[in-house]
Amino acid sequence: MTTIRTLVVAAEAFPLAKTGGLGDAVAGMVQALGHRPGGVDVQCELLMPAYRGTLDRLYRPRTVARLGGLPGGPASLVRGHCPGSGLSVLLLRNDALYDRPGIYVDDSGQGYPDNARRYAALAHAAARLAQGLPGLRPPHVVHAHDWHAALAPLLIHAAGLHYVKTLLTIHNLAFQGTFPAELASALGIPLACRHDDGALSDDRVNFLKAGIRYATRVTTVSRAYAREILTPAFGCGLHGLLRARGADLSPVPNGIDTALWNPAADPHLGGLRFDALDMRNKACCKAALQAELGLQLRADATVLAMGSRLTGQKMADVAIAALPALLEAHEHLQFALIGRGEPDLEAALRALAARYPGRCAVHIGYDEPLAHRLHAGADLLLHGSRFEPFGLTPLYAMRYGTLPVASRVGGMVDTIRDPGPAIEESCAGQGTGFLFDGSEPADMRQAVTRALRALAKPAVRDAMRRNAMQADFSWRTSAQAYAGLYANLASGPQRGRVPAPTLPLLANAA
């Protein structure tokens, strides 16, 4: 069997670095690919920046290459393995670029002003590895994730490395990595690609557009989102290019790490573990969560949880507007939130907690163990989104028998089964949650009210919880799809629709 060497390039991967779903998705995908999905032998190595503290998390790190001439200065490649998973990792080390308190933003929440150079350097390192470095065999496939890695397909193509195929996965089209066009030279973008049919959009360098334009194949993370991004409403200005690449665009849904998110074996729950066949400890998890967050200790309370970035995309503003009326109308309702984001939204949620002491708990920040306990102890998860490429958080919640109340957009259309408006025991069917249309507070309130009516019927509640906990959201099927794509890319003909300029890997602007 031929081994397909694949270099996975990403800005984050759990447990080395994580700010959200991207870190979980990359890590879960790479680990699943190590199990020969579909009988395909995939040898994955992950390339990511050496952020503060990541080197300390690697087993036996050693420097394997030094790279000069990168944007932001010279760097080194440090190879090691993740303890537990055994995942092979290459960290791009340049302390001036990456040794900082946050991954993307500073302590005030502002993006680092040199993020363009930071992630251009990552893409150039990927292109150097594609060329081959002493002691490091070149990959057959380079798999870039989101805008942070999206210059890699352009650079590999421009260097004439046609034997190395590239795959770009779009996790969130809204984040494109756009920067002033005058940075193009410093970022090492070839002159032949500095135009609107290349790496530029509206007179700005656009990392994600470059990746979509030059990658051999493009994927996104759910079937519904793959359809949505071809439309002006969801295409974020790139729908025309995506439609032009339609023959090379396909959905590969994400999965979740079902061993990590497993209420029957979750170390963060202590002795309060449970499963779909015996959910008695879920009530104990609720009591423990109430005590931890300062909520009233009421067994009859319904805990509505929210765990997400506090942004307009995640409809945090809508939740803030909808919650007071819900709390006033349902005296048994409690609200618990973990998240961080826009300062004004954080302040509004703190004010809500002060207005409803004992019924509303707000934890600003991200805490992985607490996130597990939140999903275990809550009854419902509120997950509104104006757009949602996939939606990992509802899947985590469902693993713990917490039913999502979510927007009918993107990946959640594929993963959440709504039993319909007339919720009786006989028609709970395969329902696993509740979907709503619209982005007004009234839309969200009506959906939560419908969910509360369902939970008031123990037979319906328990049936839906079992359905949710037993749904298969593992990486098995998705890993098989990626392995098949890699095999097709590695054995297929060269893609010929983009003319390859004869250019050095790092072109000079002069």
Curated annotation (Swiss-Prot):
This is Glycogen synthase. Pathway: Glycan biosynthesis; glycogen biosynthesis. GO terms for biological process: glycogen biosynthetic process. It comes from Bordetella bronchiseptica (strain ATCC BAA-588 / NCTC 13252 / RB50) (Alcaligenes bronchisepticus). It is an enzyme of class 2 (transferase). It comes from the Bacteria. ADP-alpha-D-glucose binds at residue 18. Keywords: Glycogen biosynthesis, Glycosyltransferase, Transferase. One of its GO terms (molecular function) is alpha-1,4-glucan glucosyltransferase (UDP-glucose donor) activity. Belongs to the glycosyltransferase 1 family. Bacterial/plant glycogen synthase subfamily. Its EC number is 2.4.1.21. Synthesizes alpha-1,4-glucan chains using ADP-glucose. Disulfide bonds: none annotated. It catalyses: [(1->4)-alpha-D-glucosyl](n) + ADP-alpha-D-glucose = [(1->4)-alpha-D-glucosyl](n+1) + ADP + H(+).
